Structure formats: C-alpha cells, structure tokens
C-alpha cells in the first residue's frame, strides 16, 4: 500500500490516533479535560467506521484527520517548552507522531513546479543533496528521510506545526534540534507561502545541512543566542533586558533572513540561489533572477540594520562568493556581540518578528 493511501486507511488512522492518545496522556496527565476532549472524537470515529454508510465513513475520516492535526499541533507546542533533558527522556515515538498526513499527488505537483527552476538557478550540488535525502522522488518516504537526516547531519529532526518564534527556534538549534514543519502548502499557495511549511523546511533548508558550512552556521547561531541570553540575564532592570534582547535578536534574525533564507552565491557556476525562501517559492526564485532586483555583496554591518518584508518578493538580495562566508559571518557577529555593538540596532517596526521573546526577560 502506498504511503498516501495508507494515511487514509481507517486502521492506520486509528493506529496514529491511539499513539497520539498515549502521548497526550503522558504529557497532559493532569489535564482530564484535554484527555476527555480527545477521547470523545476518537471513540466516535471508531464507532462510525463500523457502519456501512460510506458517506458517513468518509466524513468521519476527514473529521478525524482534522482532530489529529489539532492534537499533533498541541503536542508540538508542549514539546517546544521542554528542556533538552526532558525531550531526550520523552518516551513518545515521535517518528510516528511527526508523520504528516501525506498527499502524494500534491507533493508531486509541488515538486514538479520547482524542479526546472532549481536546475537553472541553484548550485548543482543542491540537487545532489536533494537526491541523497530521497527528496526528488514523487513518493516521500518520511521515515527514511528522518533516519538519513539524523545519521548524516549534526541535528535531530524536530517536527513543529508551522512558524516557530525566533527565540524558540534558536533555543532548539542550540540543543541540536532542527525544527521542520509538518504541514504542507496547498496548490493555491504554491507560488508563495507566508509561513514556513514542509516545502520550505524540508526542501529549502534540510538538504543544505549536508554542507559543513551550513551546519556550522546553524550551530553557531544557536550558540550565540545562548550568549545573548546570558548577557541579558545579567542586566539589572527588565527594561534594559527587553531592549538589549530585542536589539541583539533582530540582528540575528536579519542575519538569517539575508543568508539562509534569501541568500545568493556567485561562483564558477554564475549567480545561484541557496536561500530557503527563494528555493521553496517559484515566484520568489523567478523574481530574483528575472526581475530587476538589487544584488549586493554580503556585508554584516549592512544587513543587521536593514529591515525586510516576508510578505512580498524581495527587492534587495545579498550575495556571497563561497559558503565559508556563512561561518565567517557568525564569527564577526559574535565579535560584535562581545563588544556590545548589537545593543542599539534599529527595529524599524519589525517587533512582530520577535513574538513571545518577553518571557526571557522576566
């Protein structure tokens, strides 16, 4: 049975539902209301499947999938709040729980709309990395991808429901967890997705982790975040802590945005794209090479002071000459952090990209 067919099979749905119920019992043992809320639709679905009415079965199946996605998201949010030791001590089978309800036809169509653009506008070895992960197949073997990911990269696969606030994202990187969205965009969002999804994370970020400079970049950024927190916690007033954390964090976020999210590289192959926002979006990728976009050499002092807009195609992009520049960038950023040079970075009304960080300033 194909994977996409299996996810619609009643017995398989019940298996995942049972696994989720066990997980929720483990994590929310003190919340009887949550357990009751889950048990009711689970029991309802099991009863409906015994009926002969195919229409009711189909309706119940889709209802159950929605319920499962809701509780998966609830579980992911809870996991984000755990410490590293708590996550490692978790007995939940996350390989099963993290599996998305996969639509093979949708995956194939989303992949097909990007492949010719990747051949034209991405470095050759990016396609090699995709192939190594098995991501160029019209059938995504999610468990094989997770296994290869954890064997060949410096990170553990960490499923999330979508957007992760920067302070949570960096905290996960520091603990060597790589957040990967479990939801996939629909065809009407093919060209441009406002929020990170499976296409953005799995196709735009994950393949690059086979390159040592990318792995080191992500690891270093997580480590720098820890230094920022230590620095902030030593400040006497909450107002100082908030201002300092905001300023340092927006500098880190902009470094991410203008490199691994929207970055270009110019080498012997010519100008190519490596940023996940470009790679995952046919509209963004085409815009970067066909339209009149300003491309500048990557300069740390410039990018940490430059605001960006995630909701429209980019008008200014930055280019590197080799991927070692990503590691060099983190070294320069750390020096600026140590010298106190990141404490007066203008926000330009970009506070929305720092949502939830105040919990670190208590």
Curated annotation (Swiss-Prot):
Matches recorded under Pfam families: Biopterin_H (PF00351)
Annotated Fe cation binding sites: 200, 205
Disulfide bonds: none
Cofactor: Fe(2+)
MF GO annotations: iron ion binding; phenylalanine 4-monooxygenase activity
InterPro entries on file: ArAA_hydroxylase, ArAA_hydroxylase_Fe/CU_BS, ArAA_hydroxylase_sf, Aro-AA_hydroxylase_C_sf, Aromatic-AA_hydroxylase_C
Cofactor remark from the record: Binds 1 Fe(2+) ion.
Family: Belongs to the biopterin-dependent aromatic amino acid hydroxylase family.
Database matches in PANTHER family: AROMATIC AMINO ACID HYDROXYLASE, PHENYLALANINE-4-HYDROXYLASE
Name assigned to this protein: Probable aromatic amino acid hydroxylase
Species of origin: Chlamydia pneumoniae (Chlamydophila pneumoniae)
């Amino acid at each position: 049975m194909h994977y996409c067919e299996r996810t619609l099979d009643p017995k398989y749905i019940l298996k995942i539902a049972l696994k989720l119920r066990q997980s929720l019992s483990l994590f929310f043992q003190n919340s009887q209301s949550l357990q009751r809320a889950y048990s009711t639709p689970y029991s309802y679905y099991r009863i409906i499947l015994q009926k002969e009415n195919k229409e009711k079965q189909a309706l119940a199946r889709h209802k159950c999938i929605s319920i499962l996605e809701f509780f998966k998201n609830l579980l992911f949010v809870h996991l984000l709040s755990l410490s590293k030791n708590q996550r490692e001590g978790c007995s939940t089978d996350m390989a099963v729980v993290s599996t998305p309800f996969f639509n093979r036809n949708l995956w194939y169509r989303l992949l097909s709309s990007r492949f010719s653009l990747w051949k034209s506008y991405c470095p050759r070895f990016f396609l090699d990395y995709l192939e190594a992960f098995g991501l160029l197949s019209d059938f995504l073997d999610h468990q094989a991808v997770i296994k290869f990911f954890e064997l060949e990269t410096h990170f553990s696969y960490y499923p999330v429901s979508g957007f992760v606030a920067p302070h949570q994202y960096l905290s996960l990187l520091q603990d060597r967890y790589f957040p990967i969205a479990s939801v996939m965009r629909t065809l009407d969002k093919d060209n441009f997705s406002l929020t990170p999804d499976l296409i953005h994370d799995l196709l735009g970020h994950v393949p690059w982790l086979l390159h040592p400079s990318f792995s080191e970049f992500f690891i270093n950024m997580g480590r720098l975040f820890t230094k920022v927190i230590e620095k902030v916690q030593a400040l006497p007033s909450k107002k100082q802590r908030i201002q300092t954390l905001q300023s340092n964090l927006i500098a880190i976020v902009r470094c991410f945005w203008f490199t691994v999210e929207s970055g270009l590289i110019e080498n012997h192959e010519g100008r190519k794209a490596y940023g996940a926002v470009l790679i995952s979006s046919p509209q963004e990728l085409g815009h970067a090479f066909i339209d009149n976009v300003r491309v500048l050499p990557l300069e740390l002092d410039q990018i940490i002071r430059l605001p960006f807009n995630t909701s429209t195609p980019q008008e200014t992009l930055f280019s590197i000459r080799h991927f070692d520049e990503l590691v060099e960038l983190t070294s320069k950023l750390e020096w600026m952090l140590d010298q106190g040079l990141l404490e007066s970075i203008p926000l330009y009304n970009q506070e929305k990209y720092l949502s939830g960080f105040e919990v670190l300033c208590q």
